[in-house]
Amino acid sequence: MVNFEVVKQYLFELGYEIQKEDAENEIVVITDKNIGINNLVIDCEEPIIILEQFILKLKDKNDAQVLSKLLKMNRTLVHGAFVLDEDGENVLFRDTLQLENLDLNELKGSIDSLVIAMNEYAGDFIGFMK
């Protein structure tokens, strides 16, 4: 529970408002639509922290061109990756970090990676949904 409280404090220091919290499962959700964060789920699962945000639903989960583009996008990300959910229908941003040594800058870097990716690839994501 200590690490969960530290993560919440870091989010506060970074200026994020916790939209939802499940203290029992050590999960928080933050949103800042002005910078591309929309229901970013932050889950403290000892020994790691998982950051995950829904990006889009694929029109065709077997579209090799879209899947190839997602892999190429991953190469440019500083932290995290675009991944598919269990059904292969939804694209998510996902990153994992070690909780034991987590510091403010590391958490900020992961969130910033999502923000940069959303800005850089917004046009591609819109194209994937057409």
Q: What feature does the model see in each segment?
A:
Residues 25-28, 47-49, 89-91:
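Hydrophobic residues embedded in beta-strands of well-ordered beta-sheets
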Residues 42-47, 106-112:
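Extended Gly/Ser/Thr-rich low-complexity repeat segments
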Residues 116:
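Long, contiguous binding/interaction regions
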Residues 79, 83-109, 123-130:
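Well-ordered alpha/beta subsegment
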Residues 50-89, 96:
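Short, internal acidic amphipathic alpha-helical interface segments
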Residues 1-37, 76, 83-84:
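Charge-rich, low-complexity N-terminal segments
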Residues 33-58:
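Long, continuous compositionally biased terminal/linker segments
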